[in-house]
Amino acid sequence: MNIWIKKITENKIFCLLLTLNILLVVFFLFAPQFAPNSPIEIHADHALLDSSGQYPLGTDQLGRCFLSRLLYGGKSSLLMTIGIVVFISLAGTTVGIMAALAGGAAEQIFMRFLDVVLAIPSMVLVLVMVSIFGNGIVTTTIAIMSVSWITYARISHSLVLEFRESNFIKQAHMGGVGSVRILFKYVLPNVFPHIIVVATQDFGDKLLLLSSLSLLGLGAQPPTPEWGYMLSEGKQFMQRAPWLLFYPGFLIFIHVIMFNLLGDRLQDILDPKET
């Protein structure tokens, strides 16, 4: 663990990417404090206005300040994505570790269940759940969580099995070291770095999935500002007001690219072949 931390802190490119990602997230979490106007207040006579002093990025089809909606939408999108990734990584990792430690028939049954679920595209499962329980950001978030934790369970289970059969774990058992101490001293420090890599790379995927569902009208509902739903609202005004598509699409693109780059760089640093 100390070796990995040292390699991370010595990698200037990773530190730069990490700083930029943190600044992006923090900015949009607090950006609504600087919104020039209400994101939901309708002014029909100001519909689809170009940029001006009152509306720095123009207005949407209902005369709402588009900059304010972008800022509030960023907070909504990022908070939901962070919540999803934190939940599925913790829940999936916990379940995977417990399954690996349990062993026996229960482990085999559980892993076969994961294999069956993983064989079905997650987008299909999410769409089925949303069609059953209805549209809405809460339903969509729960649906994504319900199918996404399985990946983390599978990864953590495989990692624990690998370490469980390693020589130093067997020697620790022979030396009288308890299972709980082995778990916290040897297993978890080797599992969590890999989970962090997956979670970092998964952030962009979940943001894109959440935005895609909102674009289809299955996620955020009016008047809630959210980047994916803003794309859905703006697509019919692509010729008249292209900014309604450009700005939210660009922000989604930037966040996905930045977190993917961060995750790829972190994976290179923590690659066991290099340690």
Set out the residue ranges of the language-model regions.
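Generic hydrophobic transmembrane alpha-helix motif, especially the helices
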Residues: P56, D60, G92, A100-A106, ...
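C-terminal transmembrane helix and the adjacent membrane-cytosol boundary/short C-terminal tail
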Residues: S146-V147, P193-F203, P242-T275
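Short helix-to-coil transition segments within interhelical loops
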Residues: T59-R64, L101-A102, Q171-N190, L231
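Hydrophobic alpha-helical transmembrane segments of membrane transport/permease proteins
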Residues: F27-L62, L216-T224
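Transmembrane alpha-helix signature in integral membrane proteins
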Residues: F66-L101
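N-terminal signal-anchor/first transmembrane alpha helix
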Residues: M1-N37, F113, V191
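Glycine-rich helix-loop "coupling/hinge" segments at transmembrane-helix boundaries
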Residues: V130-I132, I144, V160, L208-L251
